[in-house]
C-alpha cells in the first residue's frame, strides 16, 4: 500500500469572538489527512442533511431510557466547546415507570419539537436502553423527511435510524450523552464531531481472520441486532430495500440469541438482499458454543451468500464506537491485508486507521448499564 502524505486538516471557526480549531482529530488517534477529493454524491432517494457550522443549534433528547441531567448538562458543555449551541428537550429529565425518559407522548413530543424547529440542525440522543419501538406508530416518514437534520445515536436508537432511512434521510450511528459527558476529547467523540462538521471518515481496518474477501457497494442499514430485527415489516424496517450493506453489533447477548436474530433476517430474505455485511462489536456476548467467537459463528452462516464480510469494525457497545452514516451509499473492500469502508457522500474525506485508535477501557458492567441490560 502506498504511503499517504499526512496533512493537518483544520478549519478555523469564529463564534462569539472565539476562534476554534476543528479537524478530523490528530495523528495520535491514527487519522491521516489526505488532500480532499470530491466523492460521488448520494443517490437522490437519500437526503444528506447539511453539515453543521459554528453557532448551529443541536437538540438533546431522550427517546428511550432516561439519562441523569448531570450527564445532559455535561454534554451541553461539550457542545458549547465545539462552538455549537445546545438546546435541551422540554421533557428531558423526566422518569416514568422507573426507566423511561417520559411517557410515549412526551418522548414523541420531544422528537417533533426538535424536528419542527428550523433552527435546530442536529439531534443527539442522550441514551439508548429501550423504548423507541413504542414510538414507531406515532411518527410518520413524511414528517421526518420534511425537515432533514442529523440524528445521532446508537443501541436502541437503531429504530430511529431505520425510520430515518425509510424516510430517505441519512443519520449517524454514533456516541451519545452517556459517553460525551466524559469530556468529548476521545476519538469516538471527536470523529463524530468532525463528521457533523463535514469531515467524512474513510476507514482503513486491519485484517481479521473471519473476514470474507470481496468488494461491494450499497446502502448502509442495521445497527443493534436485537433492536432492529423486531422492526421487520414496520415502517422502521430499513432492510426492505435492495443492495444493502448490513451493519450488525450487539452487547450482552448469548450466541444462540444472536444466531436466532440472524436466522430471522435469513428467513425474511434480508440476507439475500445484502451485497455485503459489516460486523461491529459484540461486547460481553456469550461463548456457549465452540466457535470461539461470534464472528466465527456468523462467518459460517454468511459464507454461503458469496458476499464480502468485514469483521471487527469498532462500532457499537465496545471501548471505541466510531461513527457511521446510516442510509448512505457505501463501498466496502475486504482484502487479505485488511479492509476499507468508504462513504460515497460529499465532504472532506479523512482516512482513519482504526487499528491506531485507542480509548479508555469502559468496564463491562458500565457497557451493560448503558445498553439497559443491567441496573
Describe each model-derived feature in a short phrase.
Residues 285-375:
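ATP/nucleoside-binding phosphotransfer catalytic cores, i.e., glycine-rich phosphate-binding loops
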Residues 36-119:
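ATP/NTP phosphate-donor binding region
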Residues 25-32:
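Bacterial lipoprotein signal-peptidase II cleavage site
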Residues 20-23:
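C-terminal motif of bacterial Sec signal peptides marking the signal peptidase cleavage site
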Residues 170-233:
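Conserved anion/nucleotide-ligand pocket segment
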Residues 239-294:
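Internal helical hairpin/lid segments
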Residues 139-163, 170-176, 305-308:
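Short, acidic/small-residue loops that bind anionic groups at enzyme active sites
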Residues 1-11:
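Bacterial N-terminal signal peptides that target proteins for export
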Amino acid at each position: 500500500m502506498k504511503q499517504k502524505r499526512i496533512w493537518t486538516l483544520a478549519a478555523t471557526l469564529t463564534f462569539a469572538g472565539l476562534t476554534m480549531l476543528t479537524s478530523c482529530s490528530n495523528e495520535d488517534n491514527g487519522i491521516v489527512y489526505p488532500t480532499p477529493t470530491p466523492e460521488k454524491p448520494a443517490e437522490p432517494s437519500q437526503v444528506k442533511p447539511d453539515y453543521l457550522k459554528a453557532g448551529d443549534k443541536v437538540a438533546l433528547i431522550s427517546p428511550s431510557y432516561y439519562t441523569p441531567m448531570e450527564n445532559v448538562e455535561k454534554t451541553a458543555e461539550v457542545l458549547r466547546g465545539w462552538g455549537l449551541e445546545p438546546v435541551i428537550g422540554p421533557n428531558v429529565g423526566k422518569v416514568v415507570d422507573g426507566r423511561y425518559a417520559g411517557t410515549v407522548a412526551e418522548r414523541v413530543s420531544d422528537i417533533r419539537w426538535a424536528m419542527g424547529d428550523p433552527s435546530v440542525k442536529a439531534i443527539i440522543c442522550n441514551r439508548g436502553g429501550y423504548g423507541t419501538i413504542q414510538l414507531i406508530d406515532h411518527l410518520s416518514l413524511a414528517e421526518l423527511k420534511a425537515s432533514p437534520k442529523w440524528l445521532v445515536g446508537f443501541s436502541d436508537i437503531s429504530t430511529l435510524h431505520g425510520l430515518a432511512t425509510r424516510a430517505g434521510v441519512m443519520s449517524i450511528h454514533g456516541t451519545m450523552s452517556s459517553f460525551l459527558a466524559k469530556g468529548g476529547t476521545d476519538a469516538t467523540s471527536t470523529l463524530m464531531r468532525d463528521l457533523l462538521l463535514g469531515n467524512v471518515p474513510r476507514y482503513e481496518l486491519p485484517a481479521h481472520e473471519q473476514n470474507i474477501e470481496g468488494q461491494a457497494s450499497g446502502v448502509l442499514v442495521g445497527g443493534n441486532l436485537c433492536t432492529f430485527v423486531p422492526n421487520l415489516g414496520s415502517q422502521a424496517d430499513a432492510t426492505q430495500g435492495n443492495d444493502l450493506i448490513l451493519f450488525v453489533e450487539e452487547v450482552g447477548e448469548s450466541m444462540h440469541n444472536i444466531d436466532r436474530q440472524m436466522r430471522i433476517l435469513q428467513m425474511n430474505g434480508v440476507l439475500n438482499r445484502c451485497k455485503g455485511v459489516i460486523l461491529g462489536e459484540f461486547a460481553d456476548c456469550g461463548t456457549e458454543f465452540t466457535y470461539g467467537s461470534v464472528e466465527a459463528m456468523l462467518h459460517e452462516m454468511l459464507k454461503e451468500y458469496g458476499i464480502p464480510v468485514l469483521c471487527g469494525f469498532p462500532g457499537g457497545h465496545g471501548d471505541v464506537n466510531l461513527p457511521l452514516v446510516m442510509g448512505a451509499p457505501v463501498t466496502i473492500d475486504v482484502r487479505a491485508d485488511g479492509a476499507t469502508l468508504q462513504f460515497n457522500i460529499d465532504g472532506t474525506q479523512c482516512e482513519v486507521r482504526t487499528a491506531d485508535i485507542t480509548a479508555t477501557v469502559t468496564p463491562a458492567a458500565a457497557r451493560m448499564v448503558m445498553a439497559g441490560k443491567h441496573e
